[in-house]
Design a protein with these regions (language model features):
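Hydrophobic, well-ordered secondary-structure segments
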Residues: 121, 137, 141-144, 191-194, ...
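Zn2+-dependent cytidine deaminase-like catalytic core
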Residues: 35-139, 283-285
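Short, hinge-like loop/turn segments at secondary-structure boundaries
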Residues: 122-126, 149-151, 221-224, 310-312
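Active-site beta-strand termini and strand-to-loop segments that position acidic
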Residues: 37, 151-153, 331-333
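Short Asp/Glu-rich motifs
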Residues: 116-117, 142-144, 217, 303
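Helix-turn-helix
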Residues: 32
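Flexible, polar/acidic helix-loop-strand segments at domain edges
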Residues: 144-155
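Enzymes that bind and transform nitrogen-containing heteroaromatic metabolites
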Residues: 2-28, 44-45, 68-71, 89, ...
Length: 333
């Protein structure tokens, strides 16, 4: 097997391990690490389990059995994200790798965090360790897209999400229709998937009309996980701030500024779902404030209603799923 294929095989294992930290590692990135002996056996592996605790590299070295310690000098460590080179809540992982005397390091992608940005790789190379960077780089970046966007765009990763009928309506018109009930588009399975999605995001936003007409709880009820921070956006609000644990903001600019201020505390918002309504969703699209769009389409139609937002031109389909309703996920080109 070629070295490139070997490196990709072990990096896929790193990615597999990293995903175990999806809920508890935040706001840190998900990272996996695998230590492979010179004869191709995995002698240690780990992932970043929880924010404030040991990183993936630390846990991988801890898992190495005492009888295998002597193999480290000829071993390769695979890491899905560049090892940190600064003191935070834990010591630098780059220092640990150097101290352990590893022969080679394979890194999936460079860490965009301002305190790292290649410094970990440089430190390890200066110690005489052979370093390869960029193995499965796209997959490694996509795994931590929320972390990447926060550190490169200075804002949270933003997912726009709505459900629509087959003819493109997201709800009944409250002006032209006598129907006062909420239009039920999602089915039992897709509702569960919505709650799973909420558990993975830090905050969820709706506009004033949706808040006043539907009073959505926006909580995680059909999946295990922490409730996201509820945010309501309306230009009619004079003041920004919290009321009964709900964050109210009056503009997109104020939203980003408030979130960035909050990110200086322990209650960071690294990812945001925007659920509507149509005017609110369109305002994010028009402002270019989005990274992913997720549309659920039911097979039925209604004669009249509130039209779904217009999709931007710079999009590409990531995946299509079918659960009775069709879910299409788009990303920015």
């Amino acid at each position: 097997m070629k070295q490139k294929n070997i490196d990709e095989m072990y990096m896929r294992r790193c990615l597999q391990l990293a995903k175990n930290g999806r809920l508890l590692a935040k706001p840190n990135p998900m990272v996996g690490a695998v230590i492979v002996s010179s004869d191709g056996n995995i002698i240690g592996e780990g992932y970043h389990v929880r924010y404030g605790e040991g990183h993936a590299e630390v846990n991988a070295f801890r898992s190495v059995r005492p009888k295998d310690e002597n193999l480290l000098c000829e071993a390769t460590i695979y890491v899905s994200l560049e090892p940190c080179s600064h003191y935070g809540k834990t010591p630098p992982c780059a220092d640990l790798i150097v101290r352990k005397g590893i022969r080679r390091m394979v890194c999936g992608c460079v860490d965009p965090f301002s305190a790292v940005q290649g410094r970990g790789i440089e430190h390890i190379r200066k110690a005489g360790i052979d370093v390869t960077v960029g193995v499965l780089e796209h997959e490694c970046l996509m795994l931590n897209r929320e972390f990447i966007v926060r550190n490169t765009e200075n804002r949270p990763y933003i997912l726009l999400k709505w459900a629509q009928t087959a003819n493109g309506f997201i709800g009944y018109s409250h002006i032209t229709s006598d129907i006062k009930a909420t239009l039920q588009i999602s089915n039992a399975v897709t509702k569960m998937l919505v709650h799973k999605l909420r558990a993975e995001y830090d905050a969820i936003l709706v506009g004033r009309n949706t808040e006043e007409l539907e009073h959505p709880r926006l909580t995680v009820r059909e999946w295990n996980g922490k409730n996201p921070q509820k945010i309501v956006l309306s230009s009619t609000y004079k003041n920004n701030g919290f009321v009964d644990e709900v964050l109210y903001v009056n503009s997109l600019q104020q939203l980003i500024e408030t979130i960035n201020q909050r990110n200086n505390t322990e209650q960071k918002i690294c990812s945001l779902i925007v659920e509507g309504g149509a005017h609110t969703l369109q305002s994010f699209i028009d402002a270019g404030l989005w990274d992913e769009i997720r549309i659920e389409t039911a097979p039925f139609t209604i004669s009249n209603g509130i039209a779904a937002p217009h999709l931007p031109n710079n999009i590409d389909i990531v995946k299509k799923e079918f659960y009775g309703n069709t879910i299409v996920t788009y990303k920015r080109l």
